[in-house]
Curated annotation (Swiss-Prot):
Domain of life: Eukaryota
Keyword set includes Plastid: yes
Transit peptide segment: 1-25
Name of the protein this chain belongs to: Digalactosyldiacylglycerol synthase 1, chloroplastic
Gene: DGD1
Family: Belongs to the glycosyltransferase group 1 family. Glycosyltransferase 4 subfamily.
GO biological process, one term: galactolipid biosynthetic process
Length: 786
C-alpha cells in the first residue's frame, strides 16, 4: 500500500519545486523592473525640476533690470511659476522628508543582485498544498504592500510647503514692496551687515593707540636697566651697591629729563614722584612691555608647586641653628618669636630646631644635661618658655638632625633641612641665621618650596673669622659665600644692626625683644626706688660666653690700659666657654681686679642688684644681654658701634668712643643712679613691639593680608603689580642659577670637606634615624643607576 503511494508523492514534490522556482523568478523580475521604473521616474523628476528652476531664473532676471516697479502692477511670472511648481515640489518633499523614508526604502526596494529562495515561502506553500492544494498569490501581496507604503508617504504633511519655497515666496513678497531700486540700495547701505563690515575694516586699519603713546626705550635706558639687573653679578665681583645705583641714576636721568614719562597716567606719575630712581626705571620698562602686550610667564627656575592657599590658612615655619638648654641667642630669640607669632589667629607656627645625638649633647648643653628623645627636650623647652612669658604658647616644635662642629663651635644641619617641614605647611619660612643654615645646604631650595622666605642675621661671622689664622682670606671667601646663599635662598633679609655684612635684599631693623621677666624685674626695682629704698646695691658686672670673640679681649685691654684710672673698681664676670682658662690667665697676668664666676641666667636673682652692665664687645650684632640690662633699669656702658645703635636712644645707655672715654663712662655710671624707664621705652624693648617691627620690615603683614586686600589694592600695590605682571626679572634668573650651582657644589663630599664642612653632614646618620624615627637617607632619597 505504501509502495503504491510513493511515485505520486515524488512527482508532486518535483512539480511543487519547479512551480515555486518559477514564481520566485517571476517575482524577482517584477521587482527589478519596478526598481528601474522608479529610478527613471526620479531621473525625469530631477530633470524637470532643473528645467523649471532655470526658467524661474530666466523669468526673474528682467525684473531686476527695470529701473522702477509699481506696486499696482500684476504679479510677476515667477509667482505663477511657483504656484504651478508647488504640487510637484510638495510631492517630492513629502517623499523625501519622511523620517522612515530611508528605512522603508531599504526594506521595500533594496536591490537583489542575487536571486535567493525564500524558504519561509516554500514552507508556507508546502503547508498550503498539504491542506487545500492552493497556491499563495505572492505578487498581489507585494503590490498591496507597495501601495500601502506610498499611501503612508502621501498622508504625511500634505498641508505644508517645502521650507526653501516658503522662504523664497517671503523674499519675493518683500521685493515687490520696494517702490524703486533706489530704496533697495538705500536699504542695503543702512543694513546691519554693512555697518558691521565697516566697523571691522576701521578696527583693522586703525593703529594701536598704546604703541603711539609709549615711546620706545633708548640706549641709555637699556644700559641703565642692564646695570640695575646685573647687581647680583657685580656684587659678587665686589662692586658696591651705591656705585651701581649712581651709574643707573646718571644713565636714566638724562632720558628722564627729555621724556618726562608722557606715557604714564597722572596717578602713576605721582607715584614716580614719591619713589626712587629704581622704581621709576622699573615702571618705565613695565609700561613699554605692557604696550607691546608682553606678559611675564615666570622665570626659568620658577617652581609653581607651592603651598596651596585655597584653605585660607597660613603657616609660618621658624628654622633656627640652636636649641635650649644651650643659652645662646639663636636658641632663645627664635623661641620667643614663635611664641608671640602664635598669638595671632592669622597663622599657625612651627619651630624647627636641631636635634643632637647624645655624644654631641654632652659637648654643647650645660651641666651635663642630656635628653633621650625629642619629646623629652620639647617638654623642657616648653616649661622654660612658659615660666618666662606667662602664657601657654600654641605652636608646634619639630626637630631636624644636626651635628656639632667643635672647630666652628656651632651646629651644622645634616641632610636637607627643608624636608622636615611638610609640603602642606610650606607657606612662609623664617630662617634664623640664613647664611649658617645654607652654607652646606644640599636639598630643596627654600624659595621653591615656600611662598615667602625671610632671613634674620644674628651673628657677625666675618668679625669672628678675621680673628682666626689666615682670617683675612677666609673672611673674603665667607663674605661672598654669604652673599651667594642669601641671594639664592631668601626673599627678604633682616639685619639686626648695621654691624653685619651688607647682604642682598637686606634691611636693618631690630626685631628682637627681651624676656617679659626682665621688664617685671625693672618695674619692681623702680617701685622700690619710688618708696625710697635703694634698688641697686652692687657695682659693675659683665656676662657672656667666655670666648675671646665675645668681648673678653676688648675688656682685658681696656682694663689693663686704664688700670690706674679704674683703681678700686671691681668687676664680676659671669660665663662659661672654651677660652675660660686663657681669659682668666690673661687677667691674672695683668693683675686685674676681676672676679670670675660660673655662667648663669641673666634673670637670676643674684644679678638683680647690679647697677652697671659693661659690654665692650664689638663683634656682636645686637647684644641680648645689653637689652636685658636696660629692661631691668641698669646703666649700660658699651662701645660706640653700629651693634649698639638701637640702644642709644635710652638715657641709661652710655657709649664711649676711646679707651679714655671708657673709663669716664664707667665712673659716671657708678657715681649716679639710673633713670626709670618710661612706658614707651618699656614697650620698645618688649617682644610685642619687636613682633610688630618684624611683621612690617619682613613684609609679612602684606603677605598674610594679601588675600583680604587683593580686591582693593593701594597705589603702591598697584605699582608693584603693574611691574610684576609684565617685567621679565633677570634677578630671579640669576638667583635660580646661583641656587643650582650651590646645589651641585654641595653635593660633592670632597668639596664640602675642603670648605670646612663637618664630615657626614650631607646626609643624617643611623643614630639620627633611630632618635627621630627617620628612614635611612638611601631610602628617603634613593639614587637610581644602571
Amino acid at each position: 500500500m505504501a509502495s503504491q503511494r510513493q511515485p505520486p508523492s515524488s512527482s508532486n514534490a518535483f512539480s511543487f519545486l519547479s512551480k515555486g522556482w518559477r514564481e520566485v523568478r517571476d517575482s524577482a523580475d517584477a521587482d527589478l523592473q519596478l526598481m528601474k521604473d522608479r529610478a527613471n521616474s526620479f531621473k525625469n523628476l530631477a530633470t524637470s525640476f532643473d528645467r523649471e528652476l532655470e526658467n524661474f531664473f530666466n523669468s526673474a532676471a528682467p525684473a531686476f533690470s527695470v529701473p522702477a516697479m509699481r506696486s499696482a502692477s500684476p504679479p510677476p511670472a515667477e509667482i505663477e511659476f511657483v504656484k504651478k511648481l508647488q504640487p510637484k515640489l510638495s510631492e517630492f518633499r513629502r517623499a523625501y522628508s519622511s523620517p522612515d523614508f530611508s528605512k522603508k526604502v531599504l526594506e521595500k526596494w533594496r536591490p537583489r543582485a542575487r536571486i535567493r529562495i525564500d524558504l519561509s515561502a516554500i514552507k508556507n506553500a508546502i503547508v498550503s498544498e498539504e491542506i487545500d492544494e492552493g497556491i499563495v498569490d505572492f505578487e498581489r501581496g507585494k503590490r498591496e504592500r507597495r501601495l500601502s507604503f506610498w499611501e503612508e508617504l502621501k498622508g504625511e504633511g500634505e498641508a505644508q510647503d517645502w521650507e526653501p519655497i516658503r522662504a523664497l515666496k517671503t523674499r519675493l513678497k518683500e521685493f515687490e514692496k520696494r517702490s524703486s531700486s533706489v530704496e533697495f540700495f538705500d536699504g542695503f547701505k543702512n543694513s546691519e551687515f554693512l555697518e558691521k563690515v565697516k566697523s571691522s575694516l576701521k578696527s583693522m586699519c586703525k593703529e594701536p593707540r598704546d604703541s603711539k603713546e609709549v615711546p620706545p626705550l633708548d640706549v641709555a635706558e637699556l644700559l641703565a636697566y642692564f646695570v640695575k639687573q646685573s647687581g647680583p653679578f657685580l656684587d659678587q665681583l665686589g662692586v658696591r651697591r651705591d656705585v651701581c645705583d649712581k651709574i643707573v641714576e646718571s644713565l636714566y636721568s638724562k632720558r628722564k629729563n627729555q621724556l618726562l614719562l608722557p606715557s604714564l597716567s597722572g596717578e602713576e606719575s605721582s607715584l614716580l614722584g614719591n619713589g626712587n630712581i629704581n622704581d621709576e626705571l622699573d615702571l618705565r620698562i613695565a609700561s613699554v612691555l605692557q604696550s607691546t602686550g608682553h606678559r611675564n610667564e615666570g622665570g626659568f627656575w620658577t617652581d609653581h608647586a607651592k603651598h596651596d592657599l585655597s584653605d585660607n590658612e597660613r603657616h609660618v615655619a621658624i628654622v633656627t641653628t640652636a636649641s635650649l638648654p644651650w643659652m645662646t641667642g639663636t636658641a632663645v630669640n627664635p623661641l620667643f618669636r614663635a611664641a608671640y607669632l602664635s598669638q595671632s589667629e592669622k597663622q599657625k607656627v612651627t619651630l624647627l630646631v636641631p636635634w643632637l645625638c647624645k655624644s654631641d649633647q654632652e659637648l654643647v648643653y650645660p651641666s651635663n644635661l642630656t635628653f633621650t628623645s625629642p619629646e623629652e627636650q620639647e617638654g623642657y623647652i616648653r616649661n622654660w618658655l612658659e615660666e618666662r612669658i606667662g602664657f601657654k604658647a600654641d605652636f608646634k616644635i619639630s626637630f631636624y638632625p644636626g651635628k656639632f662642629s667643635q672647630a666652628r663651635r656651632s651646629i651644622i644641619p645634616a641632610g636637607d633641612t627643608a624636608q622636615f617641614i611638610p609640603s602642606k605647611d610650606a607657606d612662609i619660612a623664617i630662617l634664623e641665621e640664613p647664611e649658617h643654615l645654607n652654607w652646606y645646604h644640599h636639598g630643596t631650595r627654600w624659595t621653591d618650596k615656600f611662598n615667602h622666605v625671610v632671613g634674620i642675621v644674628h651673628t657677625n661671622y666675618l668679625e669672628y673669622i678675621k680673628r682666626e689664622k689666615n682670617g683675612a682670606l677666609q673672611a673674603f671667601l665667607v663674605k661672598h659665600i654669604n652673599n651667594w646663599v642669601a641671594r639664592a635662598y631668601c626673599d627678604k633679609v633682616l639685619r639686626l644692626s648695621a654691624a653685619t655684612q651688607d647682604l642682598p635684599k637686606s634691611v636693618v631693623c631690630n626685631v628682637h625683644g627681651v624676656n617679659p621677666k626682665f621688664l617685671k624685674i625693672g618695674e619692681s626695682i623702680a617701685a622700690e626706688r619710688e618708696l625710697g629704698q635703694k634698688g641697686f646695691t652692687k657695682g659693675a658686672y659683665f656676662l657672656g660666653k667666655m670666648v675671646w670673640a665675645k668681648g673678653y679681649k676688648e675688656l682685658i685691654d681696656l682694663l689693663a690700659k686704664h688700670k690706674a684710672d679704674l683703681d678700686g673698681v671691681k668687676l664680676d664676670v659671669f660665663g662659661n666657654g672654651e677660652d675660660a682658662n686663657e681669659v682668666q690667665s690673661a687677667a691674672r697676668r695683668f693683675d686685674l681686679n676681676l672676679n670670675f664666676q660660673k655662667g648663669r641666667d641673666h634673670a637670676d636673682d643674684s644679678l638683680h642688684r647690679y647697677k652697671v652692665f659693661i659690654n665692650p664687645s664689638i663683634s656682636d650684632v645686637l647684644c641680648t644681654a645689653t637689652a636685658e640690662a636696660l629692661a631691668m633699669g641698669k646703666f649700660v656702658v658699651c662701645a660706640d658701634h653700629p651693634s649698639n645703635e638701637f640702644f642709644r636712644s635710652f638715657p641709661n645707655c652710655l657709649t664711649y668712643k676711646t679707651p679714655e672715654d671708657f673709663a669716664v663712662k664707667v665712673k659716671e655710671a657708678l657715681a649716679n643712679e639710673p633713670y626709670p624707664l618710661t612706658p614707651e621705652q618699656r614697650y620698645q624693648l618688649s617682644w610685642e613691639a619687636a613682633t610688630q617691627r618684624f611683621m612690617e620690615y619682613s613684609e609679612l603683614d602684606k603677605v598674610l593680608n594679601k588675600e583680604k586686600d587683593g580686591a582693593k589694592p593701594s597705589k603702591n600695590n598697584r605699582k608693584i603689580m603693574a611691574k610684576s605682571a609684565s617685567m621679565p626679572n633677570l634677578t630671579e634668573l640669576v638667583d635660580g642659577g646661583l641656587a643650582f650651582a650651590h646645589y651641585c657644589l654641595t653635593g660633592n663630599e670632597f668639596l664640602r670637606l675642603c670648605t670646612g664642612a663637618t664630615p657626614g653632614t650631607r646626609d643624617y646618620d643611623k643614630q639620627h634615624c633611630k632618635d627621630l624615627n627617620l628612614l635611612p637617607p638611601q631610602v628617603e632619597n634613593p639614587i637610581y643607576g644602571w
